[in-house]
Amino acid sequence: PEFRELLARYEKSRQLGISSYFGIDEFVDLLSYHLSIDKSDEAAAILDAARHLHPTAPENTKMEIRLLLYNGEPQKALALLNGLKFIDEIELLTIKAEIMVALRNFRQAHDIAIELLQKSSPGQECIYEGLEILLDCGFAMEALEICETALRVAPEQISLHEVKAECLIELQRI
């Protein structure tokens, strides 16, 4: 419900051509949403608006990296990532692994995903990201083993069951 309200407020301000205030986290959510529905031009406009309202926010660079990855420019994304300072280590690892997948450097993406998984515990968002990266790199069996281990610790985590299902589906394709 909160995101729908945010999206409605954003779309209304765009339709009316007025500038409305949005927090940087709201811009991050809006950009992610528009990339998920294949509207990279709108995502670029969101990034511009975020830079205008929050010129010093490090999230702007992170959003630009996401946009570059979406647009098939992983080398530029990596260069931007390497220039980032004051970024959370987990977030840095996640973004770097996504860039390595885009560059088709699956071994390095795998190693980063394992490092990410070693720094996480069941229930943390980064465990799902690490498992998804392993799947993206073709390491479905390893992802399944890690997922099953995590489920022994936290069987109530529905997202882990979903990732396990993805692993099993991927293994059937092989």
Which ranges hold each PLM region?
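Register position in tetratricopeptide repeats
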Residues: 36, 70, 102, 136-137, ...
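Short coil turns that delineate tetratricopeptide repeat
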Residues: 55, 87-89, 121, 155
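Structural register within alpha-helical repeat arrays
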Residues: 29-30, 64, 96, 129-130, ...
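Residue-level signature for tetratricopeptide repeat
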Residues: 32-33, 67, 99, 133, ...
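Canonical positions in the second alpha-helix
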Residues: 50, 83-84, 115-116, 149-150
